[in-house]
């Protein structure tokens, strides 16, 4: 099993950190003592929550010093920040690749996939695990009324929306 601190020892920078999934992944890594920061094109409720959690967020572009850059598929692969990261030989990961790396750090993974109902099903699983007293980290692809988009009580299970 991989460790977060070894896998991301040079920090992680998120391009598009204000999205529902990216902000949850940023909080998850920050909770595991990984240096995290990022940027987004616009302010959102998620960027405000990240700042409240102590994660630096820039609106617009800035210099990237972290060793790993994560971007969403919504970001143009020829975007200036990604081109600069390639030139600096940084490790580039899509959100999906990062999600796979994070899942590899857990002994048990439950991933909800499909066309409709993923967020609802993932949220329901999070509630089931909470009420069953099971140690789980939950990456929810939307806003659960109780948990928001991220919830963690332990590292035995990783619940995620694929």
PLM regions: where:
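ATP-dependent carboxylate-amine ligase
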Residues: 1-46, 51-56, 87-90
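Phosphate-binding loop of NTP-binding sites
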Residues: 4, 28, 51, 59, ...
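Structural motif
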Residues: 11, 67-68
């Amino acid at each position: 099993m991989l460790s977060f601190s070894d896998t991301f020892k040079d920090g992680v920078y998120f391009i598009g950190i204000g999205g529902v999934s990216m902000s949850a992944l940023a909080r998850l890594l920050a909770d595991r003592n990984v240096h995290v920061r990022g940027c987004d094109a616009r302010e959102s409720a998620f960027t405000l929550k990240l700042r409240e959690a102590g994660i630096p967020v820039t609106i617009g572009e800035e210099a990237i010093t972290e060793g790993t850059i994560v971007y969403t598929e919504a970001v143009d692969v020829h975007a200036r920040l990604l081109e600069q990261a390639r030139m600096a030989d940084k490790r580039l990961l899509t959100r999906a690749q990062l999600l796979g790396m994070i899942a590899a750090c857990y002994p048990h993974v439950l991933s909800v996939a499909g066309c409709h109902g993923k967020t609802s099903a993932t949220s329901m699983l999070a509630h089931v695990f909470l009420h069953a007293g099971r140690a789980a980290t939950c990456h929810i692809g939307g806003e659960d009324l109780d948990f928001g988009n991220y919830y963690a009580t332990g590292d035995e299970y990783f619940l995620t929306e694929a």
